[in-house]
Amino acid sequence: KPHNLVIAPNITFAATLNSIVYLNAEPLLLDVCPHTWQMDTQLLHDFLTTQTYLNQNTCYLRQTNQRIAALMPVHVLGNMVNMQHLLQLSEQFHIPIVEDSTEALGSYYMGKHAGTLGQTGCFSFNGNKIMTTGGGGMLVTHNEQLARRAKHLSTQAKTNPVEYMHDEVGYNYRMVNLLAAMGVAQLEQMPQFLSRKAQIAHHYTTAFAAHLPFIQPQLTTTHTQPNHWLYTVKLPQWRNLLAHLRTQGIETRPLWTPMNQLPMYAQCRYITHHHVAAQLFEHCLSLPCSTNLTPQEQEVVIEAIHHFYTSGNAAMH
């Protein structure tokens, strides 16, 4: 509802927060864990314990009396949030979980697929995801009532299969049949896609550990089986490295700008102790990791990065 608060991480793609604002609700930003780069659930625990109160099984921000309507964890880069802790907080403070699993198709937490642990989960089939339909996505839920309502709204809220009767303002969010067929074919290849992603991530990590140990990959917990969607590392001078790799015909990209550094979200309340999101933004770079990347092409990337840091190029900038 308007002016409700939705807690989301400060490191995410802007679409996460845009979806909140579309409903006239307000994002409440939370910093991320420095190791996994996911929503910091201990920081969330401390915030909810000290700065909120419960009234009739509803959680409110003490300072403004605004209702906290949802927790929106984002499984950043295909890694996963500490869902065990988050589910405990959800139950304790009566705040439902809406999982942004747009990057996490094929990721698992304690044997459960991303997007299936909260009240609802959403996935993206954008062209840069592990499987694609060119665009669009998918919503999943264990709640049949929510599923029926979502389907109803996605078909222009049409109530009669023949006559043009509508009972509320709806949306044209249906996926066209041709793209859905593409998605089914892509899903059949998911095991191979996930296997190749894991191979690429393992090779990068092994190579950097052996020769460039200061390059730090995103860490995962023992509970998490990530899909390795986008191989991203923490390293020095990422802007200079990006420019250097571009001269070699190698495309890389930085991590998302923290949400509180974007003009439309700069005034959002931000829960942080150590500004981890800003530190990650200043030091992280995503490397080529498409399932179409050949082993030979990956070696070219690794060698170019090694050359940058060992030939004096890094020191020259």
Model feature map: region roles:
Residues K1-L48:
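Conserved PLP-anchoring active-site segment centered on the Schiff-base-forming lysine
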Residues N4, N10-T12, D31-C33, S101, ...:
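Nucleotide-sugar donor-binding loop of glycosyltransferases
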Residues L23, Q92-F93, Q248, G312:
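Helix C-cap/helix->beta junction micro-motif
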Residues D31, Q42, Y53-Q66, A70-P73, ...:
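PLP-dependent aminotransferase class I/II
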